[in-house]
């Protein structure tokens, strides 16, 4: 658990229990119209079994290791899975049916959870088993590596080609109505309040990297902190790219600010958030111009991205009630304006290639300035 103090560890586990109960009550009200009676919720020591419903004791058990090792999104998926078992047993009273039979699967759909959520996930990077997605990932990685060329025009041409390849891949998926699976994952930290630069980063992923995004309620179990976190939805390939871009840009912001602060002789970090927002606004504008140039260069409308209705349906299925909020923006200080200029010079660098082609990220100090 990472806590050397048994008293602190016990207090943290009690906090986990309170959070699980709050989410149980929310799902029971939101999806099941308060059909369930409150069960006993406890933490367990199983490593492979993430959760369990015990009908005799009216008890749902969630693995401690699951909470420590996996995202809160996965923990809540397990909780809803066990609530589905509880519903089948206590409300439908389908005692003779197979535990994962038709009634159970229908309740899982009602609760928006994975029918197979209780066995330890071995996240087998799906692109390894999909030659098309693996080829796309590796080609994009190769093209981004060409973006390191000292010849500015060659570098930009390589990055443009990578963007076109991703666009062609996604347009072809939608136009051919190819079978494709969607997933969701969380990026960044759970926070009570997110600064403007994080909102710009989410907008960049949504508008240019073929994923749907949502600031969703979540919980950081290690810090006992409730707040919101960025959740992205898409195909495995697009999620891998979005995760890479998120990590790359977050890393670049810190490095650019460090250099800018030294150049300007700034003694504090007071302008740091404004500078970050400026960089990402500038990078957002650069990507918009690049996409416009790409659209103008094609002779047909075949490469115009109209969105993915299947992805939007998946997104709406998991989020039946979505609220949109407006933000107040950022005061245009000198640091913000300098950040915009720096953002227009940012270029994506190649990830460290893994089996999927998007394993980690590299940073080139000369490429962003």
Each language-model region and where it sits:
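Short pre-active-site segment immediately N-terminal to the catalytic Zn-binding motif
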Residues: 60-79, 91-98
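Short, charged, amphipathic alpha-helical segments
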Residues: 155-160
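Short coil turns that connect the paired helices of HEAT/ARM alpha-solenoid repeats
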Residues: 148-150
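Post-HExxH zinc-binding segment in Zn-dependent metallohydrolases
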Residues: 33-34, 55, 91-129
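Auxiliary, metal-adjacent structural segments of Zn-dependent hydrolase domains
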Residues: 5-58
């Amino acid at each position: 658990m990472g806590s050397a103090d048994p008293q602190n560890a016990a207090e943290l586990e009690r906090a986990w229990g309170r959070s699980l109960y709050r989410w149980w009550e929310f799902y029971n009200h939101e999806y099941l119209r308060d059909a369930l009676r409150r069960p006993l919720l406890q933490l367990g020591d199983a490593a492979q079994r993430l959760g369990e419903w015990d009908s005799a004791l009216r008890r749902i058990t969630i693995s401690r290791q699951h909470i420590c090792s996996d995202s809160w999104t996965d923990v809540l998926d397990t909780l809803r899975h066990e609530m589905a078992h509880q519903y089948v047993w206590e409300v439908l009273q389908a005692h003779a049916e197979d535990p994962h039979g038709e009634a159970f699967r229908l309740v899982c759909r009602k609760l928006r959870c994975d029918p197979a959520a209780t066995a330890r996930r071995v996240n087998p990077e799906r692109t390894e088993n999909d030659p098309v997605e693996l080829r796309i990932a590796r080609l994009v990685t190769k093209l981004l590596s060409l973006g390191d060329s000292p010849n500015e025009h060659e570098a930009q041409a390589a990055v443009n080609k990578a963007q076109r390849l991703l666009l062609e891949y996604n347009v072809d998926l939608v136009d051919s109505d190819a079978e494709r699976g969607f997933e969701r994952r969380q990026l960044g930290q759970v926070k009570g309040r997110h600064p403007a630069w994080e909102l710009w980063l989410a907008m960049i992923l949504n508008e240019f990297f073929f994923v749907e995004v949502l600031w969703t309620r979540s919980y950081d179990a290690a810090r006992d902190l409730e707040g919101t976190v960025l959740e992205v939805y898409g195909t495995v390939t697009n999620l891998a790219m979005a995760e890479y871009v998120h990590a790359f840009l977050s890393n670049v912001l810190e490095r650019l600010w460090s250099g800018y602060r030294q150049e300007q002789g700034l003694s504090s970090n007071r302008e740091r958030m404004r500078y970050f927002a400026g960089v990402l606004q500038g990078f957002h504008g650069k990507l918009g111009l690049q996409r416009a140039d790409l659209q103008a260069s094609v002779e047909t409308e075949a490469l115009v991205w109209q969105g993915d209705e299947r992805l939007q349906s998946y997104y709406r299925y998991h989020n039946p009630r979505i609220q949109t909020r407006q933000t107040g923006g950022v005061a245009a200080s000198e640091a913000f304006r300098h950040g915009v200029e720096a953002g227009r010079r940012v270029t994506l660098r190649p990830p460290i290639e893994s089996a999927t082609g998007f394993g980690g990220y590299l940073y080139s100090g000369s490429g962003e300035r």
